[in-house]
Amino acid sequence: KKGIANCLKDINNDSRPFSFIALGGSSNGSIFDGHNYTYVGSTWGKIVDILIDKKCMNPIIFIDELDKVSRTEHGKEIIGILTHLIDSTQNDIFQDKYFGNVDLDLSKALFIFSYNDVDLIDKILLDRIHRIKFDNLILEDKIIICEKYLLPELYKNFGIENIIHFDENIIKYLIE
């Protein structure tokens, strides 16, 4: 999922800056919109952090495990913030608590969500998401992805290119 999102290009065929946020176990909205600057040790939220890091206002922000947001009041706060972030009628005035009344225009940012169980996602938020459904991959597709993309990256990261090679039978065994 993340690999597909990371390959998205703009109209000039340029890659847009990409960031990843894992929601699994998140239970507080301040992860996105920060804390008031008057609190000791407070800081801005992840959205502002991404804008600063990527030095742009139109990054791709991949939010993983949307269906894992807690069902508490804090989880509802997260859902409310996410709804605001992707709602085109209001995401041009996002405010991080750390910066007070400073409006940030996120209307050019692209938010991508991944999830496993659509039934666990808030219906109001889901209504604002354009859904693309992927069918489960067959074994042959998984082998191709592993051989062409995953293994070369692992070989490079561990410095074992041209040293170790996984036979297709081993890959098949590991996948099954």
Regions found by a protein language model. Give the residues of each.
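Alpha-helical scaffold elements adjacent to nucleotide-binding pockets in ATP/GTP-utilizing enzyme cores
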Residues: 3-7, 31, 77-85, 124-128, ...
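Helical "lid/switch" subdomain of P-loop NTPase nucleotide-binding domains
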Residues: 4, 43-44, 59, 65, ...
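AAA+/SF3 P-loop NTPase mechanochemical coupling elements
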Residues: 54-62, 94-114, 164-166
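Conserved C-terminal "switch" segment of AAA+ ATPases
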Residues: 14-15, 55, 117-127, 131-176
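Active-site phosphate-binding and catalytic loops of NTP-dependent enzymes
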Residues: 16, 43-46, 90-100, 156-160
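Walker A/P-loop
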Residues: 1-22, 52-53, 83, 87
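AAA+/P-loop NTPase substrate/partner-engagement loops
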Residues: 10-42, 50, 70, 141
